Amino acid sequence: MSDGDYDYLIKFLALGDSGVGKTSVLYQYTDGKFNSKFITTVGIDFREKRVVYRANGPDGTVGRGQRIHLQLWDTAGQERFRSLTTAFFRDAMGFLLLFDLTNEQSFLNVRNWISQLQMHAYCENPDIVLCGNKSDLEDQRAVKEEEARELAEKYGIPYFETSAANGTNISQAIEMLLDLIMKRMERCVDKSWIPEGVVRSNGHTSTDQLSEEKEKGLCGC
């Protein structure tokens, strides 16, 4: 896809404590590489990737491909940047929430991050995918998979164990998040929840596009 040749521009936000591997995960997704020497993110950074999204119909058939320009925003996890980070919550449509499988405190802080999202995101029930990162460091694991899955089930969100080092489940986690977002847009009658930054390449907002489609149900917020 060339510049501007897409159907939707969608922003995702990666968040979690400092050092959980947000930058490395996004870099692995966009570039297919692992860099162990990344310095701690200061403020906000982002990466981009073009993908084609195809929804499965109720009969199992694959729908028309939607060309998606993903902006993947990388946030600082340090407390001193928290006010800057939360300012970006409302403009994002989906959230990749990471913790470090070798750091129990980063897992315990997941509840705090979800509380922040419930307060500052576009609605109280935003689309979130939880990722336990650094699954390749099994001998250093401090968080049991059962614990993480139980927490994810409590909040009704998907859970993946990922590795930026070898790429395990990173594409699957982001594709799951995109699928949740696209399905939410399809079923919403009230389009006011959609952040203004979600635009079509022809200059129309996603709200303009969706208002032309058949209304299928209420928004899940």
UniProtKB/Swiss-Prot annotation:
* Example GO biological process: melanosome localization
Reactions listed under catalytic activity: GTP + H2O = GDP + phosphate + H(+)
Localization per record: Membrane; Melanosome; Late endosome; Lysosome
Q: What topology in the membrane does the UniProt record assign? A: Lipid-anchor
The record gives the effect of mutating T41S as: Increased rates of GTP binding and GDP dissociation
Q: Which SMART domains match?
A: RAB (SM00175), RAN (SM00176), RAS (SM00173), RHO (SM00174)
Q: Which family does it belong to?
A: Belongs to the small GTPase superfamily. Rab family.
Q: Which protein, by its recorded name, is this?
A: Ras-related protein Rab-27A
